[in-house]
UniProtKB/Swiss-Prot annotation:
Disulfide bonds: none annotated. It catalyses: ATP + H2O = ADP + phosphate + H(+). Pfam families: Helicase_C (PF00271), HSA (PF07529), SNF2-rel_dom (PF00176). Residues 1367-1520 form the Helicase C-terminal domain. Residues 1-54, 184-230, 537-669, 686-782, 1586-1607 are annotated as: Disordered. Belongs to the SNF2/RAD54 helicase family. SWR1 subfamily. InterPro entries: Helicase_ATP-bd (IPR014001), Helicase_C-like (IPR001650), HSA_dom (IPR014012), INO80/SWR1_helicase (IPR050520), P-loop_NTPase (IPR027417), SNF2-like_sf (IPR038718), SNF2/RAD54-like_C (IPR049730), SNF2_N (IPR000330). Residues 555-571, 701-711, 1591-1605 have a biased composition (Low complexity). Residues 572-581, 639-652, 712-723 have a biased composition (Acidic residues). This is Helicase SWR1. Component of the SWR1 chromatin-remodeling complex. Residues 835-1000 form the Helicase ATP-binding domain. Residues 215-226, 590-600 have a biased composition (Basic and acidic residues). It comes from Candida albicans (strain SC5314 / ATCC MYA-2876).
Amino acid sequence: MPENGRLRRTSARLTQNGTSTSSSTIYQNGKRTSQHAQETSTASNKKRKVSTQSKEDKLSDIIVDFNLAVNELYQLKEYKSIISWDPIENSSANDRGIKAEFEEFVKNNDYRLVWDKEIENNSNIDSLPLRFQKKKLAEQNKLLDDKFSIRQNVLASSKMLEESLVNKTRDEVKIESTFKAIQSQEKAGSKLKTPSQTSNAKTNIRKSGSTTPKRGNENGSRKQALEDQDEIIELSDDSSVVEIESDLSDAETHYRIKCIKKTVPPPLVTHPSHIPQWRPENLEDGNRSTGRLIQLKDSSSSSKIINFDPTPLEIIQLKDEVIAAPKLTEKLQNFLNNDFKTPIIDESNVPDYNFTRDEYNTIMSQQEKLLRKLYHKVNIENSLELNGDKIERRKVILPQSNIKLTDPFRNTFSVKPKLHGAANNATHQDYLLAQGMAFSKVHQQMRKQHHLRTRKIAAMIDQHFKKKKGEKERLAKEREQNLKKMSRLTMQAVKKRWNQAQKVYQIIQNEKEEELKKIKGRQHLSEMLEHSTQLLEAQLTSSREPTVEAESDDNSTTFDDNTNDSDNFSSSEEEENEEDNTQQQINGNKKYDVNGKSNDENDMSLSVEELRKKYADLETSVEPLSSNVTSDKERESETSSEDAESSDDDDTDVTRGLASLYQNDEVADFATTTFEYSAEEKKLIEDLNQESDSRMNSLLDSDSVSSISDSESSEESSSDTEMDQSNVSEPPRSSETGSNTGLASLFTNGTIVSDEEDDASISSNFENESDESMNSSDRELEVNGNGKIDKIASTDEDDSNVEIVNGSKVKDVPIPSLLRGTLRPYQKQGLNWLASLYNNNTNGILADEMGLGKTIQTISLLAYLACEHHKWGPHLIIVPTSVMLNWEMEFKKFAPGFKVLTYYGSPQQRAQKRKGWNKPDAFHVCITSYQLVVQDQQSFKRRRWTYMILDEAHNIKNFRSTRWRALLNFNTENRLLLTGTPLQNNLMELWSLLYFLMPSSKVNQAMPEGFANLDDFQQWFGKPVDRILEQTSAGNSDLIDENERTTQKMDEETRNTVARLHQVLRPYLLRRLKKDVEKQMPGKYEHIVYCRLSKRQRFLYDDFMSRAKTKETLASGNFLSIINCLMQLRKVCNHPDLFEVRPIVTSFAMPRSIPSYYQSTNELVKRQFNKDEKVSFQALNLDVTGCENMNYFVCQSTGKLMTTEPFQDQINKLKILLVEFENSDPINYVSYYQRLRREEQAEIKEKLEHVVYLNNLRCGRKPIYGESLLRLLTVNAHDFSDEPYNKYCLTLSGRVDKMNDTIEKYSIITPAAVALDMKDQLIPISTKQRILHEVAENKIDNPFHKAQVKLSIAFPDKTLLQYDCGKLQKLATLLQELTSQGHRALIFTQMTKVLDILEQFLNIHGYRYMRLDGATKIEDRQLLTEKFNRDPKIPVFILSTRSGGLGINLTGADTVIFYDSDWNPAMDKQCQDRCHRIGQVRDVHIYRFVSEYTIESNIIKKANQKRQLDNVVIQEGEFTTDYFGKFSVRDLVSDSNIGKEITDRTIDFSGDAKMGNVLAQAEDEEDRVAAGAALKEVAIDDDDFKEETRSATTGATPAPTETNALSTTDGDAAFIDVDYEDGIGHIDEYMLRFISDGYYL
């Protein structure tokens, strides 16, 4: 390390540094003290002992020196100085431990001593857990101890030595400060001059001071040593001033204190320059001024420790509390006047202090040298220039001018004078003058430039000194601004900390308040539900009392026979026990247990008369529930009975009905004794009582007759309904006043049946009945506008006319005659339940599962109102746009007697339909859509509607939307909601639907308090649903067992919460599932088919997941980008062509092949190398047979016509010329050229001779036989058949046809590149010319076209469509198996492009199919579905998931195949219900294709969780599905390689509109257009249910929060520190306590 020299001397310097400051005190009067001499001798003795040290002692010294050196180095590196260095702070002798920063410094720089490198190799120790790190270090220490036996002794001795060394240094510092204080006191005492009379007082004071008890420890710190010094006191006695030394506490009272002097000792170390060889680490980065000043010091002085012994600072405090230091003031004044100078420094970061005279002179000389260099560079060398406040290199800027500047001397060598005229007769003088004028202009321009440059330099210098003139003020202002800024930041930080503390305190308080609120809410809920259970049973019994009285008054034998009939007692034992328990509770005679089981004897053994006597006194206990029309005597008797009953049951306030449960002050207490009526009021009450009794008797008489026909009609269907209905019984009816309804109209006579009792009383097929439906109220009321009660219930009907619908007893109503069709048993029960809702003036929700016939039940209800109550309407039915036509067709089919108005069309058409609709019986039923009813809400609000029915009512789940508020204010008598999935997302939606059922005034009268307060409702029932899943599902199963009872797996608390919610919802909701109510319906079996990815799919999937962009996108957390990635992965799983279309392979076409460029050259070279000397036999007439085609006469004529004489004459002449010049040599140019000419002539002569020779040979040819003889002797050949030749030698067209199959089969590999001239090289020229000729005449086509195209363009094989996708491979096998067994399948997919691929797949395999997607029109959809259901020859129907869920009945199919799963499992469930519904006669098998080890397998797990929640909702769940409507990115992407980099972002797919928007943005452009067309119809419904939250209002008013006022006390009690004894503790705790005590406002 670079600090080795310093590290070795650190411990010695530490001791020297600690003792050097006391060197001045050791010498007194030039003599050395004995103490110092003794120390010197001790040090010399130590040096002598070094040589005799053992090995352990040497190692200990090395360790101590090294530790102290590292400690000092850390101090210098961290604080740039050792002014306040405490060696024990980071020493091993420190008991408080070593700082983590020091350990990090040692670790990073590897400043440690190593015993053995191999053993102490800790390179990988940081990657281990903490417990393994400790274990490894312990093992290392053990190995080192085993190897070095002296290690522990060396470490212990080094620690002791280091501790003694550090403590010794600190003790020397304390001794030194104490010695100085004593020395200063002695000097002051020697200078004391006092009269004799004051010396005695001084002596007395010193003596008293000597008896003063000691303060602090004997080994006290430096502060205590300073406090122990005697203080100098000046006493004034008249004119004499005496200075004495004593403690202030010992001063006598007869002295007056004039002033007090205190001495402040100097610091131990004052400057880092006092340490040898110390320099700053980075002079360039920081502390430049300090580094410069240190460099200015003499190098010789830096190698020694400078003795720094300043005199102590004396401070005087006068009587007027003025503190002064006169010596310090004089020193400062002397320094500023003589030694301090401020040089001019052109650096803003250098402060203007700490300059002595030498430093000033040094810096000034440097500045002078710098200015001289700048002057030389700027003015002499002209290499620099002053640009503002910067000195930069000079830039040469050429003047911009349009005039071309030329040098007259260099370019033209002269300046021509300008003269008028064409002639230039200028003389030498003219040229000289012109030259001088031009030169003068040049000098003038240069002079101007010099002037301008001088002005600029002067301006810059002036600006520079102006800036320097205000440098001090500017620096002072900057320092002031910095201080203000620091103060402001500090203030803001403190304020921010207090604000944070206040927020934390507020959060803590809110948590406490929320916890208290939850506790109160649970108590209130428990009390409410307990009282509700008691009073519901009480009202069940009280409803029978008026009937009992009527039976006792009426002695007709018919009624007695009916009541004595054994069928009246066919109800189950469970219901009788409940009735007995209710009566016992009201009478206060007996108690009942939690399950409602009675301890009394069974009422089955009692006769009717005995029962009348037994319950004769029941009226007094339940009178307040019946009517307020009673006499004063009856009220007194009721009051007395109530007083008697209150002593037995204090918890139940029967006089208030259900109002006592909800603490509703608006419900009046009519049963108290405080009511007093006048005479007129009593008379009016009696008249009303008589009138109601007469009307009740007439109604009883009329209903008794109708009950006979009802019973006869019920006997015909008894065989069908025997297995569907449980044991039935009819409790008697009674009426109530409209003012005291509360929840009475909702919960009247409602029985609370436990799960165990349901299993025992209801048939086996109704085991899970409580999972699907809710009870309804039994009491039937109709309140008129004047508050009178019309009793419409008939109590003389047989018990066979009363049935139990899911635990509630409702009246069996007759099937209306207007209804065309037959109702199934459970549909008849639904009609009874709906009729009871109307009779009780209660609204409800029919939440049957999709496919159970909610439409026909609604139509039967309207028909019942028309037939039985003569209520023809008008009724308003609001449905989605896509099913308006379906509703109209259902009305025409099942209830053609109604006038139906389908309200749709343009604004003009709708206005035309509204004309005259206020007339009576203009229409009975109005069917419209959500969108239109909101647009024309003013017209609909002006009309009074009998029933408002909302189909798909779960779409009004948002109570903040404009549509919800608009429909809430419609003028309707009753409301009915139809939904197949009442709870899709959260409990707020359920609250929204329930609140919608009870608008305006019904909220305070007919609803519990919890319904009106969303916060309480959420707090009671809206707990997270993950607890249910933890207990009910393993979460990894592929299939959900819907028949498994989920409640059995819940814990007690969860089961209780579900039971509470059931009790609150039971009057409003009726829900049945197909598997429970429709026993003739076949079973439904679901199969998960895992499909392996094909090789191409796996390659694309892994390639996409391994892309850096994909990892970056998933890790970024951007919502749309993540969805886009997930969509791409789903496309790969569905089919790789959706992600990347298999390309059409084409070859690269080259105009010429590579060999063609050098083929001709190659042939020529080959010909030259293979050239052989050959003899032409034909030219020499040696080819005997070559002349047989010639005639004799032709040969003779040829010989005669031969003319060789001209050639021979020319040859002879050339011979003569050549002979003359044969031996002549060239002697000159002429002879040379003549010789060249003779050589040419000789060559010509040789050619002519060769021509003559060849001509003679050719003309002398003669045949042996001749052509005539050969023709004469030739005989014609026999004509053989050409069939073998034609068989093997085909024509061109025949060869093309024969090779087509070979080309088709074996042309499978497309080359990467093809050459267009290959056919020219392979096909002979003759053949090519013949083909071209025939092609030009259109005789044949190009025979090579197919081979060329087949090789150059390769289209994907159609069979690859199946083999590229694992799902299609599975689908091919599955369809082959299904069609062979006669099954028909529905194939659902989410993506529109998958439908196109499925069409190609079905066409390849030859299956007949039909297609339906979002682009199919509404009128065509019905035709397609009917055609498919009628024609069994069509085995496959492919549909879009969204279009398949919109009012389609496809019972002709018995198999459902989900090619891909929808994000929302509710959509898949709707698709299943299109096949598994009423009319299906075969078992339905559902196959769900899932690509294994992909995103789809993760999606199906989440979908299964939500589907299991569907088994829990409404009956067994905690009614919040937000957990399942959201997906986690990390859960979906199961790739472990990038799982750590992905942000665990939650993706919400709970809303269909949100889902559609996200998918539309994530898909490709082509697929987006196709999906938009496919989802066109869904978009219309989405427009109907589009939420508008801009003008949203809060659904519930939060409860006010109580705030406790801060309690303050008077006097000092408000400021008592209550934490004084325990201590402040952490600052955060102190701030919280400070705020909680109310001091922080």
